[in-house]
């Protein structure tokens, strides 16, 4: 299957169903009263972690994710049905952002759910709107709009250990030697163009190792596999630098690798590192290894030959030891298994802007919510909308901005006269 680790989508939560105006009309029942039911809630767009998924290929080609709308209320006080949610399966390690790169949430566990776009609330029917002062209202509420916006989705592979190095240093050969993974192995650069995962077991302790695409100088600027490669390293708890003794200067290669990590994210240098010198069967490899050990202090260096498999078990035990002594990283943005993200801000915020001498623009979630709930073809519904605006202080704010009787007030796409 083609590996895709980035997708751009637009999510549309369902609108709430409309409440209706109805009255109880039965024989021998005088003054039956209001009987209009409420609308059902719109469906939300919910992403679900699935350990069986390993690519964002489906999301790449499914640009629009739409949840169904709630059902309108019915007479005899019957409420409309809530719409089913739209569940979208994604791989573990999927991260969600808005179009302007604001973090929404991430999926780390199997069956973990993340509500990205919340469905609209169903509107109230006239039965639910009845009060002591108005026992038979002739108006109802329209359903709230569901949230809709563009998102960016990234997959950062979940692995305990990441193998990194320049192209053709032996990463794919190493992961196939220590696990049952079978990546493509060839003698030309960039054979690995997608991450490969392998499970390694040492004395009953198992962990996941990722063979990541080859890194080149200036990868943090987008060269080679660029950021598509570097972002996968962020998940790994331990990094294994694979240096080829075929190189004229393995130490310089090591410095270049760490410089690329630093330029992308300085926090990556805080991760534990193991250095592997591969191709120790080549001439002059021992001399290069001696020079390397003189320059690099305090980090384990394991000489390796994937021809004779020397020191392979030592490397596996070192990986296991490092992992068991490295605490799991906790993402501060993801404290709960269930995360609800909503684009709405403070409901009580009202903004009044003077657009011209006689036109004032009013915005704010509370105003816009009641605007969309109002049926402007129903006079009683419009009167209720005006009462609500006065109650939440809009009239007072307009007067502070200099609004006079006869001026116009713009709310969403509609103009009103200021009286």
UniProtKB/Swiss-Prot annotation:
GO BP annotations listed: ribosome biogenesis
GTP-binding as UniProt keyword: yes
GO molecular function terms attached to this record: GTP binding; GTPase activity; magnesium ion binding
Disulfide linkage: none
Cleaved signal peptide residues: none
Predominant localisation class: cytoplasm
Domain OCT intervals: 342-419
Coiled coil: none
The protein's Enzyme Commission number: 3.6.5.-
Keywords: Cytoplasm, GTP-binding, Hydrolase, Magnesium, Metal-binding, Nucleotide-binding
All copies of domain Obg, residue ranges: 1-158
Residues the entry annotates as binding GTP: 165-172, 190-194, 211-214, 278-281, 305-307
Residues that hold Mg(2+) according to the record: 172, 192
Co-factor requirement: Mg(2+)
A GO cellular component entry from the record: cytoplasm
Localization per record: Cytoplasm
Classification via HAMAP family: GTPase_Obg
Function of the protein: An essential GTPase which binds GTP, GDP and possibly (p)ppGpp with moderate affinity, with high nucleotide exchange rates and a fairly low GTP hydrolysis rate. Plays a role in control of the cell cycle, stress response, ribosome biogenesis and in those bacteria that undergo differentiation, in morphogenesis control.
Complexes and interactors: Monomer.
Family note: Belongs to the TRAFAC class OBG-HflX-like GTPase superfamily. OBG GTPase family.
Official protein name in the record: GTPase Obg
Species this protein is from: Aster yellows witches'-broom phytoplasma (strain AYWB)
Lineage: Bacteria, Bacillati, Mycoplasmatota, Mollicutes, Acholeplasmatales
Gene giving rise to this polypeptide: obg
């Amino acid at each position: 299957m083609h590996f895709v680790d980035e997708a751009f989508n637009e999510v549309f939560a369902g609108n709430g169903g409309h409440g209706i105006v109805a009255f109880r009309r039965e024989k021998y029942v005088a003054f039956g009263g209001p009987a209009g039911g409420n609308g059902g809630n719109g469906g939300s767009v919910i992403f679900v972690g699935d350990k069986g998924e390993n690519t964002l290929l489906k999301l790449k080609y499914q640009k629009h994710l739409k949840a169904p709308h709630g059902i309108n209320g019915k007479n005899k006080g019957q409420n409309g049905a809530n719409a089913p949610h739209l569940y979208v399966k994604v791989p573990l390690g999927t991260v969600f952002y808005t179009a302007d790169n604001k973090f929404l949430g991430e999926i780390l566990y199997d069956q973990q759910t993340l509500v990205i776009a919340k469905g609209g609330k169903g509107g109230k029917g006239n039965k639910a709107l009845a009060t002591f002062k108005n026992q038979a209202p002739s108006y109802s509420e329209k359903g709230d709009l569901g949230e809709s916006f563009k998102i960016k989705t990234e997959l950062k592979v979940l692995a305990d250990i990441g193998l990194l190095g320049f192209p053709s240093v032996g990463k794919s050969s190493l992961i196939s030697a220590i696990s049952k993974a079978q990546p493509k192995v060839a003698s030309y650069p960039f054979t690995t163009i997608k991450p490969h995962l392998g499970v390694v077991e040492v004395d009953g302790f198992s962990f996941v190792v990722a063979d990541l695409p080859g890194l080149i100088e200036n990868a943090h600027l987008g060269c080679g596999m660029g950021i598509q490669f570097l972002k996968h390293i962020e998940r790994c708890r331990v990094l294994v630098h694979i240096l080829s003794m075929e190189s004229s200067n393995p130490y310089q290669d090591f410095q270049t690798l760490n410089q690329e990590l630093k330029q992308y994210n300085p926090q990556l240098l805080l991760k534990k590192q193991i250095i592997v010198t591969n191709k120790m069967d080549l001439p002059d490899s021992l001399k290069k290894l001696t020079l390397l050990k003189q320059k690099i202090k305090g980090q384990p260096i394991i000489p390796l030959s994937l021809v004779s498999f020397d020191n392979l078990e030592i490397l596996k035990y070192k990986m296991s030891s490092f992992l068991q002594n490295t605490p799991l990283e906790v993402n501060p943005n993801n404290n709960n298994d269930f995360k609800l993200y909503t684009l709405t801000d403070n409901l009580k915020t009202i903004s009044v802007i003077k657009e011209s001498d006689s036109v004032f623009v009013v915005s704010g979630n509370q105003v816009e919510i009641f605007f969309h709930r109002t049926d402007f073809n129903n006079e009683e519904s419009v009167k209720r909308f005006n009462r609500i605006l006065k109650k939440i202080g809009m009239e007072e704010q307009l007067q502070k901005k200099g609004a006079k009787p006869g001026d116009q007030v713009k709310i969403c796409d509609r103009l009103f006269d200021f009286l």
